[in-house]
Amino acid sequence: MIKKIKRSYSNFTALLDYPRIHSGLNKERKLFFFFYTWAFGGAERVHISLLKLFKALDPICFITTKSGNEGFKNEFESNSTVINLGRWAEKVSYKKHMYKKLAKMINKQKSPIVFGGNSEFLYEMIPLLEPHVTIIDLLHNFADFKQGSEWRSLPYTRRIDKRIVLGEKLLEQLKNHYVENAIEESYLNRVEIIPNFVDIEQPFQKKDFNGILEVLFVARNSPEKRFHVVKSIAEKCQKLALPLKFTVIGDFEDSEDMPQNIQLVGAIYDKSVLNEFYKRAHIVLLTSRREGLPMVILEGMSFGLIPISTDVGELNAYIGEHKGNGYLINNPIDEEQIIASFVVKFTEIMEERNELAKVSQNAYDTVKREFSFENFANAYRKTILDSIPAK
């Protein structure tokens, strides 16, 4: 009964919101972004960077799924005209109407560009978009159980004009995905690699690796991030009396079994506040089951934090003991094995403190060299602006 009342209320408020959505569609535009959410996350930070990069074009940004929190709402709204579709992107009958309305509005533009990131709503609208509409899709990573963008977009692959992936590993996954699903190899010519960037705001500052080391874990509370693995690692390190303090930033709840060496900070949306945690920490931790090119690792390295992470996504192209800039842990199915490997690595690090300053410097140098804003901006400007015909 309560759920029914909530749905009815959501439907009612959606109808009240329709005039605002309608008025936001009247202006002539060239660039339309469709993003999944404005909630806390690495992908959303990338999406904000894209909105900032093309702010001069006065883009419109559609949020196509209910966001779990206010997250980066202010940053989205300060860099674009944001329309949060809400129920109009959820309720089937409403959604069908909105597909037609948005497609009609986009089709009326002279040379429109539609850019999507993790938006199932956009994929389902693609059949209504006319041939003169350029469609660009950013694929952050592959998901579990055939639930990700690579599967949801499959029926529309041949209509997507350009596709962006974060690195060679994801490109290889996409190639295999096309082969397995009878997508012609020629469509790989539409795929471009553009790595993320890291905004390095300060010169390298040496860290003191004596005393208790602070391990920073920054993530949203979702299954693939595996916070329970972090808890187990911290608990085992505590039993071994390793001088480590784990600071956790994200929407995680406290519990009776929380190890004493874990401090829960909560979610932080203000980048300047988050940066203060990066500045004081020594190690950035990632325990994810899957990732693309995780921003938290790159951001940590930009402050000289030493990365210790599961070997996921594109990380092994840039990080590893052989590169002297961090540590990757094998990512088998057995989580107990993963936990044990992390604990072994933390134990080794405590015994090799004299090497950590060098690893920290190398981590900083890696992101400064490989993930510059200039490379990111030039690549996206070429991809998007080249799609806009000259007047």
Regions found by a protein language model. Name each.
Residues N11-I21, Q147-W151, K175, N189-I212:
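Acidic anion/phosphate-binding donor-loop and adjacent secondary structure
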Residues E44-S49, L213, S222-K236:
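A conserved mid-protein helix/loop that constitutes part of the nucleotide-sugar donor-binding site
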Residues T81-W88, E253-S272:
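Nucleotide-activated donor-binding/catalytic signature segment of Leloir-type glycosyltransferases, i.e.
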Residues I160-R190:
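A short, active-site helix/loop in glycosyltransferases that binds the activated sugar's phosphate group
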Residues N275-A281:
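Short alpha-helical donor nucleotide-sugar binding micro-motif in glycosyltransferases
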Residues R289:
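Aromatic "clamp/platform" in nucleotide-sugar-dependent glycosyltransferases that forms part
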Residues I306-S309, E314, I319:
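Short hydrophobic beta-strand element within catalytic cores of glycosyltransferases
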